Amino acid sequence: KAEEEVEKNKEEAEEEAEKKIAE
């Protein structure tokens, strides 16, 4: 489903943002 892809992308984007903030 495309919706599942969107959810996955959102979660990955949040993780990347957290990593950048942690640095």
Curated annotation (Swiss-Prot):
Composition bias, Basic and acidic residues: 7-23
Span list, region Disordered: 1-23
Taxonomic superkingdom: Viruses
Main function: Gp22 functions in head assembly. Internal peptide VII: Cleavage product of Gp22 that is incorporated into the mature phage head.
Protein name stated in the entry: Major prohead-scaffolding core protein Gp22
